[in-house]
Amino acid sequence: MADRPRTLAEKVWEEHVVARGEGEGASREPDLIYIDLHLVHEVTSPQAFDGLRAAGRPVRRPDLTIATEDHNVPTVDIDKPIADPISRTQVETLRRNCAEFGIRLHPMGDLEQGIVHVVGPQLGLTQPGMTVVCGDSHTSTHGAFGALAMGIGTSEVEHVLATQTLSLRPFKTMAINIDGQLPPGVTSKDVILAVIAQIGTGGGQGYVLEYRGEAVRAMSMEARMTMCNMSIEAGARAGMIAPDEVTYEFLKGRPHAPKGADWDAAVAAWDALRTDEGAVFDAEVHIDASSLSPFVTWGTNPGQGAPLSATVPDPADFADETAREAAAKALRYMDLTPGTPLREVAVDTVFVGSCTNGRIEDLRAAAEILKGRRVAEGVRMLVVPGSMRVRAQAEKEGLGEIFTAAGAEWRQAGCSMCLGMNPDQLEPGQRCASTSNRNFEGRQGKGGRTHLVSPLVAAATAVRGTLSSPADLD
């Protein structure tokens, strides 16, 4: 297999096959794949540990397993007991399970605590060529390092804990070619929202997406993680970017990154992790980066988006009946009128954070817009770092002072308002400009309405009170 040109995804896959499934094509049996890194949190792991306990099995590789508390944790008063009994039980259960099975845990208050997809990269645990899994759909984030990273279900969590392997069928591959240079004020969040709008929320189903092209190479690691994070919103199994000097610069010196001669050997191996010339993808998409502008969702799935300069679409303009019905239903829930300029849509809340946009670069971008300005009257803004280490760095740079001076709430680390599983939620009817990844009905709280945006758009929106880009503040 190695004598033919291969894609990045194929290379990583084939390096991890423990046992190849019998057969060919659609009838091929699953391969048994070795897992290099298993990330765990409090929501999808309790039943998995119960299964191990019932079967009398240990965790096979606790040294390749790391846990953190993120989904259910509060982002204020973290020194007090968690108020919600279900959330408190899940967090306490994770602590007991990690202690019993010998798994390293970063609890609330720990400097390395935070959202699992922020913590893994910041510790240098995520490295090129790895297979990475977690009981969380946005595990695809780690693909920004050239890793094959996938979200898995609770039964699969148990299987990996017990065997350090997964039974999987090979995925198809899709190249997302983003050529040219991004205009000023356009970010990777705008790019991925545009990709999803183009191919749809099911366009990537069954595929691993590989992001390629000049615009991708020019992105920071934080920006690349944002794009790979939302591959799932396009229906994909994973997203990947070949490692390069940007990757190595990010990783070098991190706690779990190789050191000395091991680092040199690792980089030499990582340099081979790129799609070979002549390799054939199952599908390809081309996007002109120079044509993109700040993007925003108007509906109730991430594919229902448009440039901020557009108006709310008319369902009648959709050619497909299913799309027309979906758009009409979304607009009813979002309480939007066709033809309304998106820049005139007022918000109650702005959220900057999540595993999509809760890293230090995202906070710097938001702070740059907020510096010397105030959050609009009647708007509540939450800024939630993706990890306690990100928060510490932001404090060191004075970003926390900028947020609070502007009237925003500067909080502790956690998933926060990305999802309605902790105290940070919208009230029914409230509208939020959010840097998170999903805008489903009730995602941020029952009856809440979500517009997905970049940190730049979020900060500008907080200042003006309506969906806005930084250019609108000039």
From Swiss-Prot:
Sites where the protein binds [4Fe-4S] cluster: C355, C415, C418
Reactions mediated catalytically = (2R,3S)-3-isopropylmalate = (2S)-2-isopropylmalate
Q: Keyword annotations for this protein? A: 4Fe-4S, Amino-acid biosynthesis, Branched-chain amino acid biosynthesis, Iron, Iron-sulfur, Leucine biosynthesis, Lyase, Metal-binding
- Which residues does UniProt assign to the signal peptide? none
The cofactors named for this UniProt entry are:
[4Fe-4S] cluster
Give the record's family classification: Belongs to the aconitase/IPM isomerase family. LeuC type 1 subfamily.
What name is this protein filed under?
Answer: 3-isopropylmalate dehydratase large subunit
Q: Identify the species of origin.
A: Nocardia farcinica (strain IFM 10152)
GN (gene name): leuC
